[in-house]
Amino acid sequence: MNIKPEEITSIIRQQIENFNTNIETIDSGTIIQIGDGIARVYGLEDCMEGELIEFPNDVYGMALNLEQDNVGCVLLGAEEGIKEGNVVKRTKKVVEVPVGEALVGRVVNSLGMPIDGKGPVLTTETRDVEVPAPGVIDRQSVKEPLQTGIKAIDSMIPIGKGQRELIIGDRQTGKTAIAMDTILNQKGKDVICIYVAIGQKQSTVAHIVNDLTKMGAMDYTIVVSSTASDSAPLQYLAPYAGCSMGEYFMHKGKDVLIVYDDLSKHAVAYRTMSLLLRRPPGREAYPGDVFYLHSRLLERSARLSEKLGGGSLTALPIVETLAGDVTAYIPTNVISITDGQIFLESELFNAGQRPAVNAGISVSRVGGNAQIKAMKQVAGTLRLELAQYRELAAFSQFGSDLDKESVKRLEKGKRLVEILKQPQYGPMPVEKEIIILYAAVNNHLIDIPVNKIKEFEKELFNYIDTHYRDIGKDILEHKQLTDELKSKLDKAINDFKNVFLSEI
């Protein structure tokens, strides 16, 4: 290539004019120790708590321990190929996850990356994983019901939008089943559901996703999965990531339901991380801030004020107990953070009462305001009558003669217990719950044999749907049982009862 001498001078002049003196500075550090998913890094002077740190091989870490001479980082990926002496860089960003409508119907990991084989999540919006909870002024009181479709819960332990209701019980007592039924019951109610699986078996998560897909619930559900094979840092991040995804919809004025399954495994993952970071252990070897770990997560559930759009985030955290011991560290912590608890007992479960809700020690501290008036009218005495029945049942085991009133109460109690039984994946619309509870509480079932109650319930709904279709509509419209509606209900139940008893 021949360049003329006069061209050379113009090229040099051009280069000098376009010469860029910008210097790019990168905050970097050196790994001085690595192992067990923890890296100690020297030289990151102005690092933030919770900042993303870039490691070799496209692996990111999170700065958790800011010490005088080094920074303790947890790795959010595989540590293979990363060794002492490697250079790491600051990103000057905290951990964030993708949010938006594109996530609905997807299964993602703790960092929002898809793991369902359906291609990338097409969204440009992200949100920090750790966000401060809304303040007192930004909230309004819980006053709208969130129906679970489970008779025992909607009647005695009602949940409102924006509430945090703990589901607590031993393993294999139906905790996840209650959460799943609640998700299924939100179909067609414009509620976004998020199921966060923490430390579960991969087969269990696959089974849940399969069931949700089969029932058509994945159309409004996001599944965030951090299974038992994931590292402790990823399990630790999962609920915060799910919460951020839910907050996006809450700030858009929508109602969101989020299930954390379960926070016991979350605390164990955090304990693992803390001990590896050499933080001092406390009770049951958990670190001192394990209460704050869960309180800052659950406080993010709220019903926002109308000024902020009036959206809500309702949380159903799940905690597993050992041999029914609710006085252990994590259960007592979460009980004191939440607005009530649904306590499930293995004795009731094994006795065939499913859902195995112990109505005696289960409470809802704020949901009563959210209950519709019609449900309050039928369920007002339910808890008391069940408690009296249990007491009488225990007393009658001694074989002593009971007076007529006590026998009547026992018979009514047996039917109430039978009515509160419900199969899994069978959530019930609120108007049907009210109809059958009205029948049970007002002694309409006293002459129906206990073993025929389930059959009676099923056929009663069919009868009312055929002959008294307007009853359900009236309940939903007025949200209370007027005298006219009560007499209509009494007539419908008595008409059907005469037909039913004549066929037995």
Swiss-Prot record:
One of the record's GO cellular component terms: plasma membrane
EC code: 7.1.2.2
UniProt catalytic activity: ATP + H2O + 4 H(+)(in) = ADP + phosphate + 5 H(+)(out)
Membrane topology of this protein: Peripheral membrane protein
Broad EC category: translocase
Binding sites annotated in the UniProt record for ATP: G169, D170, R171, Q172, T173, G174, K175, T176
SUPFAM superfamilies from the UniProt entry: C-terminal domain of alpha and beta subunits of F1 ATP synthase, N-terminal domain of alpha and beta subunits of F1 ATP synthase, P-loop containing nucleoside triphosphate hydrolases
One Pfam family recorded for the sequence: ATP-synt_ab_C
Site residues by UniProt (Required for activity): S362
Alphabetized UniProt keyword annotations: ATP synthesis, ATP-binding, Cell membrane, CF(1), Hydrogen ion transport, Ion transport, Membrane, Nucleotide-binding, Translocase, Transport
KW Nucleotide-binding (keyword) present: yes
Compartments in which it is found: Cell membrane
UniProt keyword Nucleotide-binding, yes or no: yes
Taxonomy, superkingdom: Bacteria
Gene Ontology terms, MF aspect: ADP binding; ATP binding; proton-transporting ATP synthase activity, rotational mechanism
Role played: Produces ATP from ADP in the presence of a proton gradient across the membrane. The alpha chain is a regulatory subunit.
Protein family: Belongs to the ATPase alpha/beta chains family.
Oligomer and partners: F-type ATPases have 2 components, CF(1) - the catalytic core - and CF(0) - the membrane proton channel. CF(1) has five subunits: alpha(3), beta(3), gamma(1), delta(1), epsilon(1). CF(0) has three main subunits: a(1), b(2) and c(9-12). The alpha and beta chains form an alternating ring which encloses part of the gamma chain. CF(1) is attached to CF(0) by a central stalk formed by the gamma and epsilon chains, while a peripheral stalk is formed by the delta and b chains.
Name by which UniProt lists this protein: ATP synthase subunit alpha
Origin organism lineage: Bacteria, Bacillati, Bacillota, Clostridia, Eubacteriales
